[in-house]
């Protein structure tokens, strides 16, 4: 694979100098700062990420445990928040008489989060990492509080939007913190540990939400974030988190806000993202895909995005998304790979429960238990692969293997029928989860290993945006595939049943609206439609394999910069 060019290295040095004129750029030929990659065909030396610049050594021991526990809990809560509301929604709509607002309970969070994510990269690049992370989490907690005390559906939607604003900077902030705390070869293990445990929030969210809704009140779906947030505050408040590059202090912060955050770029990007996501939300649901509203939103998003690209090109290295960074093969392929990975994860997370609830006839809580094999195997492989990458140094084999295994796993899901045995759906899910887990963190490691410290926060933000963008897009595609297929298959397998009555009834209530003699045909139509959705996931998994080839064959075990001496506290 092509390694970073000399031109890119010169650009990196220029960006560091431009961002911090009081410092000289790092000597790219210094032995301690360069790791020569033997596997590169051109033998070009690769600048290795530097360590903390605030005079502190890498974080170890109990302080590292406290930091990792804190950021893992925060990421867990954020992912829990995305799924816990699903089982509480029926009770919420009954209390507020707000069935037409159901879509906004999820999309308000998504719109606010996706539109802010790129700006969070500039925030972490220019401001104190620890306090930026804590601030985003505080906003997330405020949103949770607003949702918990909501007295109307509109107040709940506002609370979800506020929580989304806070959530926009949590994951990329966690990855940036890990990059500043430990050397490169230790990051895969810690990143895998964080992602492995945090993503348990996705699967246990519906279980906890169902329990709260049934035995206490749906408001505890949001209140639960508050006491855990207090624990996180105690874990992080008194621990120093090293910085990978100098950050401004005092009055210079005002200069950074005005000149370095690229607020114009944000003002152009945010409406483009919101219009695009709204078009996906409305299309095929509230409005037809060929309606003037949906077409207008797509056109508005495209026009605004063109203006955003032109502005970013004009801003150069001070742009919210620097052109010199996004043109790097490792960066853009990492973004695409992570986006496709999240697409496969979300498609399975949404449609496996539909298979179990609609076709197998189980309730929401039990369907959450039934998808545990994929989530647990994913978490286990994320932790194991991270440890092994740190030990042997190469991330690309894991990403390629993950794409292959995930493709096979999704392919096996397309064979599901109403009579699929327990052993098969457990085994297929284990294979699927293992494939996703093996490659889940590799795009993050690839980007961090190939970028200088000033660009790591921006790259993490861009990768997180691709997570939202690809996830939303593929879920919309999946919805179109499922709905159209269900209409066609109902005509084939249950011709006496009106397709629209089944679609309107929903995945859990259609059994009551179907005559007993027609139910087997309806179940078969449902099963075939879910199978077609998994074909889409197969395509996304294959794409992760293809684009992984561009992430580069690099050994992360390069020489680290000399550690600062002294007995300063971490």
Curated annotation (Swiss-Prot):
Q: Which domain of life is it from?
A: Eukaryota
Reported consequences of knocking out the gene: Does not affect the production of azaphilone pigments (MonAzPs).
Q: Quick one: where is this thing mainly located?
A: membrane
Entry GO MF terms? pigment binding; transmembrane transporter activity
Q: Where would you find this protein in the cell? A: Cell membrane
Query: How does it sit in the bilayer?
Result: Multi-pass membrane protein
The record's listing under SUPFAM superfamilies reads: MFS general substrate transporter (SSF103473)
Transmembrane parts of this sequence: 65-85, 99-119, 131-151, 162-182, 192-212, 221-241, 263-283, 293-313, 336-356, 369-389, 392-412, 425-445, 455-475, 533-553
What is this protein's expression induced by?
Expression is positively regulated by the azaphilone pigments (MonAzPs) gene cluster-specific transcription regulator pigB.
* Bias kind Basic and acidic residues: ranges: 28-41
Protein name per its UniProtKB record? MFS-type transporter pigP
UniProt organism field: Monascus ruber
Name of the encoding gene: pigP
């Amino acid at each position: 694979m092509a390694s970073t060019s000399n031109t890119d290295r010169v650009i990196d040095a220029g960006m560091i100098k431009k961002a911090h004129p009081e410092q000289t750029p790092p000597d790219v030929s210094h032995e301690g700062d360069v790791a020569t990659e033997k596997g590169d065909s051109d033998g070009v030396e690769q600048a290795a990420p530097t360590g903390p610049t605030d005079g502190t050594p890498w974080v170890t021991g109990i302080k590292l445990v406290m930091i990792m526990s804190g950021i893992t809990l925060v990421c867990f809560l954020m992912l829990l928040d995305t799924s816990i509301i699903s089982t509480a929604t029926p009770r919420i709509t009954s209390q507020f008489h707000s069935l037409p607002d159901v879509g906004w309970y999820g999309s308000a969070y998504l719109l606010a989060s996706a539109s802010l994510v790129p700006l969070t990269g500039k925030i972490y690049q220019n401001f104190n990492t620890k306090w930026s992370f804590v601030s985003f989490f505080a906003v997330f907690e405020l949103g949770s509080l607003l949702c918990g005390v909501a007295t109307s559906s509109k107040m709940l939607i506002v609370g979800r939007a506020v929580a989304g604003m806070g959530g926009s900077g949590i994951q990329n902030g966690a990855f940036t913190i890990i990059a500043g705390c430990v050397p490169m070869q230790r990051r895969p293990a810690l990143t895998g540990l964080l992602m492995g445990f945090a993503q348990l929030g996705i699967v246990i969210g519906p279980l906890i939400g169902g329990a709260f809704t049934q035995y206490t009140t749906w408001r505890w779906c949001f209140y639960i974030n508050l006491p855990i947030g207090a624990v996180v505050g105690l874990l992080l408040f008194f621990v120093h988190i090293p910085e990978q590059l100098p950050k401004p202090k005092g009055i210079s912060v005002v200069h950074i806000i005005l000149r370095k955050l690229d607020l114009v770029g944000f003002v152009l990007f945010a409406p483009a993202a919101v219009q695009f996501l709204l078009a996906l939300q409305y299309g095929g649901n509230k409005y037809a895909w060929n309606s003037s509203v949906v077409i207008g939103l797509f056109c508005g998003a495209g026009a605004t995005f063109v203006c955003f690209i032109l502005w970013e090109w004009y801003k150069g290295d001070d742009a919210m998304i620097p052109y010199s960074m996004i043109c790097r093969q490792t960066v853009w392929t990492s973004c695409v790979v992570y986006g496709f990975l999240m697409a496969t994860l979300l498609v399975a997370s949404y449609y496996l429960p539909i298979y179990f609830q609609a076709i197998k006839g189980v309730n929401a809580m039990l369907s959450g238990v039934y998808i545990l094999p994929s989530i647990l195997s994913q978490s286990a492989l994320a932790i194991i692969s991270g440890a092994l990458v740190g030990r042997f140094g190469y991330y690309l084999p894991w990403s390629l293997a993950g794409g292959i295994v995930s493709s096979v796993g999704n392919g096996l899901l397309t064979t599901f029928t109403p009579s699929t045995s327990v052993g098969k759906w457990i085994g297929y899910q284990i294979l699927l989860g293992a494939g996703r887990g093996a490659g889940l963190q590799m795009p993050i490691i690839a980007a961090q290993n190939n970028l200088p410290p000033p660009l790591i926060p921006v790259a993490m933000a861009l990768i997180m945006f691709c997570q939202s963008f690809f996830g939303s897009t593929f879920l919309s595609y999946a919805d179109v595939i499922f709905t159209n297929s269900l209409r066609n298959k109902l005509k084939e397998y249950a011709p006496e049943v009106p397709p629209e009555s089944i679609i309107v009834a929903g995945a859990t209530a259609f059994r009551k609206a179907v005559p007993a003699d027609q139910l087997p045909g309806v179940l078969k139509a449902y099963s075939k439609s879910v199978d077609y959705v998994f074909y889409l996931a197969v395509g996304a998994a294959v794409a992760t394999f293809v684009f992984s080839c561009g992430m580069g064959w690099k050994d992360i075990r390069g020489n680290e910069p000399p550690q600062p001496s002294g007995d300063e506290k971490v």
